[in-house]
Amino acid sequence: MKLMELTPWETPAVIDYKKTMEQFGVKPIVDVLGDLKEEHHFFRRNIILGHRDFERIVDAIKNNKEFAVVSGMMPSGKMHFGHKMVVDLLKFYQKYTDNINIPIADLEAYWARNMSFETTKELALNEYITNYIALGLDPEKINVYLQSKYQKVKDLALILSKRTNWSEMKAIYGFKGETNIGHVFAPIVQVADILHPQLDENLSPEPKPVVVPVGIDQDPHIRLTRDIANRAKEFKFIPPSSTYHRFMTGLLGGKMSSSKPETAIFLTDDEKTVKKKIFSAKTGGRETLEEHKKYGGVPEECVVYELFLYHLILDDKELAEIYQKCRSGELTCGKCKKMAYERVVEFLKDLKEKREQAKEIAVKILEGKY
């Protein structure tokens, strides 16, 4: 059997999550959630399906212990509903900790994607930080920073770079001879992003659990970070925990991507654009209305149902009713798309108003003046 190849820069269009988790030693999260399963619909609906050492975070939440969260961003395009998933998770964690760290990977963007620092900063400010605040993140509980400007992380990356070598980096990431050295070093900066909450400003140990919520494509960073944490004995690091969520399917099937506007609903899309995208979306309906009513739809293959599942319907009973009506053929694709369109438009209209209020706060956060 051919093994799955994962890198943070090339996500497969289709992922067999079960096989991939088994291959890389990621455990099913349902085994450790306990009562926490009812605290977020991502847990209840198996949208978050895997973990490494998440029991540490469950223990911290249950017993009111200190822990930190790290969730980086590499702005390469407009923010869409797939990105919103991360904010929904951070909103969950901010109920239990005020130590939420959001690195902006401008160094990685420069080295790996040839993006200028100015472009990355502008995208981060206008598309991401502003939306993060508008979506409900508490500015008092987040530490947002540019990698290129945060000396603590850069210093730590230089120190930790001694704890790995070219052979390991090549094996994990598949780097080639023509890969620039900055790109090779970028994962070490990510390691420092993840581990720095366990140190004070003088890089002295302040060990605490850290959780990193990611897609499975980011697991190479997690594995490297955990290995380096165990090697750097002088810092007394607790290896970071991680959770793994499913990717949202693109509107036309396959991957959702900022570089392919037709595959995603952006948080700044207007009403006309949303309507066109949703009514063109791939569904789990049959080829004809007659067949759909006779055999029923397949919501598991429907991108519109996925919007309900991930974002638009938080009430489990209401979602179950839509599922059953689709399966029975009672609910047609046209009616379902109309419902999704109306809910998305209502959501984006409200978000637009909140975004106007969030812009000034976002600027202050990025300038370190909030």
From Swiss-Prot:
Motif segment ('KMSKS' region): 255-259
| Annotated localization | Cytoplasm
Question: What Pfam families is this protein classified in?
Answer: tRNA-synt_1b (PF00579)
Q: Where is this motif: 'HIGH' region?
A: 75-83
Gene Ontology CC terms, in alphabetical order: cytoplasm
Catalytic EC class: ligase
- Subcellular location, principal: cytoplasm
Q: What is this protein called?
A: Tryptophan--tRNA ligase
Organism for this UniProt entry: Methanocaldococcus jannaschii (strain ATCC 43067 / DSM 2661 / JAL-1 / JCM 10045 / NBRC 100440)
Lineage of this protein's species? Archaea, Methanobacteriati, Methanobacteriota, Methanomada group, Methanococci
Gene it is expressed from: trpS
